[in-house]
Design a protein with these regions (language model features):
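Hydrophobic/basic alpha-helical segments
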Residues: 1-194
Length: 194
């Protein structure tokens, strides 16, 4: 991972984009020679590791940086499915059951929040968040939701203190009430791929 002198992830994202672009080129050149299943295996071998490696750390950046990776992901999905250059990719992601960069980030945050909610994290992390019922005693429908930390800057919005409660509060209760981590992960995947 690359971190520059201004503590931004721009150099790392440039590196990831460069590696993904090479792999997209390989997928594009082989698009008419390999089956969809084989190209999907190539995607998960050549591209997916660059997107997921320490994603929860470096993906907390500006959307403009992540959009570069997302556009390369869209090119890769078009190559896997032999779609036209301007084909709409949302149905292709769903058909192939591939998560885009934003959904991968959401999944990572949801997994962290599940561990927090079920006290599976080290003691250092146990007092990061408060539920609304801990802040006030009113019986509201959002009493069980985590309180979102107020932010004055965009940099704070990139932190887990802000993103964690936002993601957790958006999940349906049938998912957040689960106690098994593998089941939770599968249900969140289904929720994101809808």
């Amino acid at each position: 991972m690359y971190l520059d002198e201004h503590l931004t992830w721009k150099h790392h994202i440039n590196f990831v984009c460069k590696q993904i672009a090479k792999s997209v080129g390989i997928l594009s050149r082989t698009r008419f020679y390999l089956s969809c299943k084989t190209k999907l295996m190539l995607y998960y071998t050549l591209i997916y590791p660059y997107i997921t490696y320490c994603n929860s750390t470096w993906s907390s950046t500006y959307v403009s940086n992540l959009n570069r990776i997302y556009s390369l992901q869209k090119r890769a999905v078009r190559a896997v499915t032999n779609s036209e250059y301007r084909a709409h990719t949302a149905p292709l992601f769903t058909k192939l059951k591939i998560l885009d960069i934003f959904q991968i980030n959401t999944l990572d945050i949801a997994k962290f929040m599940f561990c927090y909610h079920n006290n599976l994290l080290p003691p250092l992390f146990l007092n990061l968040f408060m539920t609304n019922s801990q802040v006030h005693k009113y019986d509201t429908r959002t009493a069980g939701n985590y309180r979102v930390h107020p932010c004055r800057t965009n940099i704070k919005k990139f932190t887990i203190l802000y993103q964690g409660p936002k993601v957790w509060n958006c999940l349906p209760a049938c998912i957040t009430n689960l106690s098994s981590f593998p089941t939770f992960k599968n249900k969140v995947l289904e929720f994101l791929l809808k």
